[in-house]
Amino acid sequence: MEPGFWHEKWYKQQIGFHQQDINPFLVQYWQRLALPAGAKVFVPLCGKSLDMCFLAEQGHQVIGCELNELAVQQFFSDNQLEMTQTVEGEHQHYQTEQVSLYQGDIFTLPKRITQDVTAFYDRAALIAWPEEMRAQYAKQLANLLPSGSLGLLVTLDYPQETLNGPPFAVSPNWIEAHLTDDFEIQALACQDVLADNPRFVKKEVPWLNEAAYLLKRK
């Protein structure tokens, strides 16, 4: 999955992965993390997700990382937020009062940027990677997170052979096999969301499960 793939998607605005509403699992389960209002929350591969607005409304300081510059700029313009822009090593740093976004490669994001986060939220990052790259991303996420930090992970699972990702299918078995070395994992919910996703229906995907997990960095 080359960076050019995602840049092309954003420049052509082929962003079906961008949700127009706040993720229901985020609304339903975020309070389970029991974070203080001022907690710093890391959002990897954040795009221009409205979920970051929800997190900021909970009083959190949001730190996001996004590869594409247009996605970051659209987050601030779509939400009518004034921001400042500076250079932070290999990354462009965009900041407003409660949201701080780093535009660039997550694999070169300095660990000091996330060293004092207390939580993370991954809805569209893990499922963005094909299987041959997913474990590498999961290790980098773990590397960026301090021990004890809590996270809400949202995944999609479906018969991968029925549709070319992204989003890619991530099964409970994959979670168990690849995340347990670095995280304590608690499954929170799983539901079929096929009817809400016309692209999957059109491709005759037989089922599409969205699942939520509570994670704790070991």
UniProtKB/Swiss-Prot annotation:
SUPFAM superfamilies: S-adenosyl-L-methionine-dependent methyltransferases (SSF53335). GO terms for molecular function: thiopurine S-methyltransferase activity. Its EC number is 2.1.1.67. Gene3D superfamilies: Vaccinia Virus protein VP39. GO terms for biological process: methylation; response to metal ion. InterPro entries: SAM-dependent_MTases_sf (IPR029063), Thiopur_S-MeTfrase_Se/Te_detox (IPR022474), Thiopurine_S-MeTrfase (IPR025835), TPMT (IPR008854). S-adenosyl-L-methionine binds at W10, L45, E66, R123. It is an enzyme of class 2 (transferase). It is found in: Cytoplasm. It catalyses: S-adenosyl-L-methionine + a thiopurine = S-adenosyl-L-homocysteine + a thiopurine S-methylether. It comes from the Bacteria. The keyword Amino-acid biosynthesis does not apply. Keywords: Cytoplasm, Methyltransferase, S-adenosyl-L-methionine, Transferase. One of its GO terms (cellular component) is cytoplasm. Pfam families: TPMT (PF05724). Belongs to the class I-like SAM-binding methyltransferase superfamily. TPMT family. NCBIfam families: PRK13255.1 (NF009732), TMPT_Se_Te (TIGR03840). This is Thiopurine S-methyltransferase.
